[in-house]
Amino acid sequence: MDNSVRVRVPATSANLGPGYDCIGLALDLWDEVSVGVLDRPGVMIDVTGEGADTVPHDESHLVMATLRQGLVELGYPHPDAGLHLTAINSIPQSRGLGSSAAAVVSGLALAWGLARPGFPLDRSALLTMAAAIEGHPDNAAPAILGGAQLAWLDGEAVNHIGLTVNPSIVFRVYVPDRLVPTALARQVLPEQVDRVDAVHQVLAASLLVTALTTSPEHLLAATQDWIHQPYRRALMPESAALTDRLRGRGVATVISGAGPTVLALGSRDQLEKVSDVDTAGFVAHDLVLGEGVHFF
């Protein structure tokens, strides 16, 4: 029995405008997490990087809690064993870059490594488990499978289709200092939307798949949103203003996930041409698509 496991899990950006709760992509920004079995009960948790001073250092830590749940579900003979968790975090937390999905996915992958040593990850099983915990698969699917994913729930089953992103498309995230809890970003959404807005949303979401894969010249139109970003503007005015500035320059730009990070996507030339846009209060990262969670 192998008593230590290490995994890398990517940041993810969900929604991409109109693909609310169903489209997401993995980016090459990583958390590296390892676990070792102790010869005594209890837990040790060491965190460096993002969240080091804010995340809990006990059993309530999301990676640890998910790891414990995964050990039980996978039939590990000692699910209450003492564990030493080490996390080196590069994914900003509560910024709309899938930090909670990364924690859930890394916990489940670590559990798999302990319970099934030597066996490759069953990504389908991990996705089912992660979606059950998260409640929606838009971040979990790319975190596990990598690349861009269209994912949806059918009862308890998770379906997904990988999207082959046009190689000309690159990504830039603008990460602000401020946080916006996902729960708060969901609370401001209306229970119902106008039918005209719904029709526009369906059109844009359909166009988004084509724009991402074969026709990137349509990305600006394909990333327009009517059902969630307008209602969240008041929670993240700086992010909304930056999105407006970049879109006004012709660059496809959205709020990443529940925000407040801003995601711009297009060709390298397009992104270089907006390097002069005022981004005070944000840190920019140029990224490409990432692979899914993996042992290393």
Curated annotation (Swiss-Prot):
GO terms for cellular component: cytoplasm. Pathway: Amino-acid biosynthesis; L-threonine biosynthesis; L-threonine from L-aspartate: step 4/5. Its EC number is 2.7.1.39. It catalyses: L-homoserine + ATP = O-phospho-L-homoserine + ADP + H(+). SUPFAM superfamilies: GHMP Kinase, C-terminal domain, Ribosomal protein S5 domain 2-like. GO terms for molecular function: ATP binding; homoserine kinase activity. It comes from the Bacteria. It is found in: Cytoplasm. It holds the Pfam family GHMP_kinases_C. GO terms for biological process: threonine biosynthetic process. InterPro entries: GHMP_kinase_C_dom (IPR013750), GHMP_kinase_C_sf (IPR036554), GHMP_kinase_N_dom (IPR006204), GHMP_knse_ATP-bd_CS (IPR006203), Homoserine_kinase (IPR000870), Ribosomal_Su5_D2-typ_SF (IPR020568), Ribsml_uS5_D2-typ_fold_subgr (IPR014721). Keywords: Amino-acid biosynthesis, ATP-binding, Cytoplasm, Kinase, Nucleotide-binding, Threonine biosynthesis, Transferase. Its main location: cytoplasm. ATP binds at P92, Q93, S94, R95, G96, L97, G98, S99, S100, A101, A102. Catalyzes the ATP-dependent phosphorylation of L-homoserine to L-homoserine phosphate. Belongs to the GHMP kinase family. Homoserine kinase subfamily. HAMAP family: Homoser_kinase. This is Homoserine kinase. It comes from Cutibacterium acnes (strain DSM 16379 / KPA171202) (Propionibacterium acnes). The gene is thrB.
